UniProtKB/Swiss-Prot annotation:
This is Pantothenate synthetase. CDD domains: PanC. GO terms for molecular function: ATP binding; pantoate-beta-alanine ligase activity. Keywords: ATP-binding, Cytoplasm, Ligase, Nucleotide-binding, Pantothenate biosynthesis. The keyword ATP-binding applies. GO terms for cellular component: cytosol. It catalyses: (R)-pantoate + beta-alanine + ATP = (R)-pantothenate + AMP + diphosphate + H(+). (R)-pantoate binds at residues 75, 167. It is found in: Cytoplasm. Beta-alanine binds at residue 75. GO terms for biological process: pantothenate biosynthetic process. ATP binds at residues 43-50, 161-164, 190, 198-201. The keyword Protein biosynthesis does not apply.
Length: 311
């Protein structure tokens, strides 16, 4: 058996690998020198939300930052937009160079699934709720590819955005239940000036739809302010905003607890919304304080709430 040498890695520049074995060998060698491996998984079409994840990863002392770019076919159903999903690899690599990323891992589907997509990770009951109720195979595909990325890169830490909050919760669940030695870091949603959560799919919206899409974050904001009166009041306030924009076909609007279990009567919760504008599906969510009376000074507390779209 011929031993393969470790692929070349040059510090101070972007190193691009497509084969899982190559990136595994490089990260293993770097880890042996005491470096920490930090992973930012993406599907490409990078925007400011992704770059915020990368910048958070780069703040880890001694980190080698690995960004994966892979449009995972396993998480798309037959009727979904796999073929239309934006692929901008050259521009993405330029963005990674500008951010000082160390490694880009850009496998093909054949690289990731050389024996076909036959073994998957079952997401459990939470994977059949919210997004999973509408996309029953989605989270099995997500968790499978994330586990494969973890097994290949062996990161000490991995960064995910909170926009896909259910995905983040399920990844944390998988790490706990399967005893994976990786720390998961969630990063707050990055928003456009009008509040729309940044997403690679936003580019599908025409000018009218783009303006209408701002109702999603406005609805969440209304729900957050009403949450002191309880969950039902929060949902009613958010629904009233969405009803003003009938072009948005709402798939769900729900309040859960911070781990996406049933909403508490009092305490921190998470309001989640998903809907369609034309052929484009959009997700958003926000943390809310449920059942806490307004009272003197409470408005000031809300005014200090972290709202990235307040300019």
């Amino acid at each position: 058996m011929t031993r393969r040498d470790t692929p070349k890695f040059t510090a101070g520049q972007l190193n691009v690998y497509t084969r899982p074995g190559d990136v595994a060998a490089v990260t293993r060698a770097l880890r042996a020198t005491g470096r920490r491996i930090v992973l930012v998984p993406t599907m490409g079409a990078l925007h400011e939300g992704h770059l915020t994840l990368i910048r958070a990863a780069k703040r880890v002392t001694g980190a080698v930052v690995v960004v994966s770019i892979f449009v995972n076919p396993l998480q798309f159903a037959a009727n979904e937009d796999l073929g239309a999903y934006p692929r901008t690899l050259d521009a993405d690599l330029d963005a990674l160079r500008a951010e000082g990323v160390d490694i880009a891992f850009t496998p093909t589907a054949d690289d990731m699934y050389p024996n076909g997509m036959r073994t998957t990770v079952h997401p459990g009951p939470l994977g059949a709720e919210l997004e999973g109720a509408l996309r029953p195979t989605h989270f099995a595909g997500v968790l499978t590819v994330v586990l494969k990325l973890f097994n290949t890169v062996r990161p000490d830490r991995a960064y995910f955005g909170e926009k896909d909050f259910q995905q983040l919760a399920l990844i944390r669940q998988m790490v706990t239940d399967l005893d994976l030695e990786v720390e998961i870091q969630g990063v707050p949603i990055v928003r456009e000036p009008d509040g729309l959560a940044m997403s690679s799919r936003n580019r599908y919206l025409d000018a009218v739809q783009r303006e209408q899409a701002g109702a999603l974050s406005a609805a969440l904001l209304a729900g957050m302010y009403a949450a002191g009166e309880g969950t039902a009041a929060a949902v009613d306030a958010a629904r009233a905003v969405l009803d003003e924009v009938p072009a948005i076909e709402v798939d769900y609007l729900e309040v859960r607890d911070a781990m996406l279990g049933p909403a508490p009567e009092v305490g921190m919760g998470r309001m989640l919304v998903a809907g369609r504008l034309g052929a484009t599906r959009l997700l958003d969510n926000i943390a809310i304080d449920i059942g806490v009376p307004s009272g003197p000074g409470r408005q000031a507390e809300f005014d200090e709430h972290e709202l990235p779209w307040r300019n």
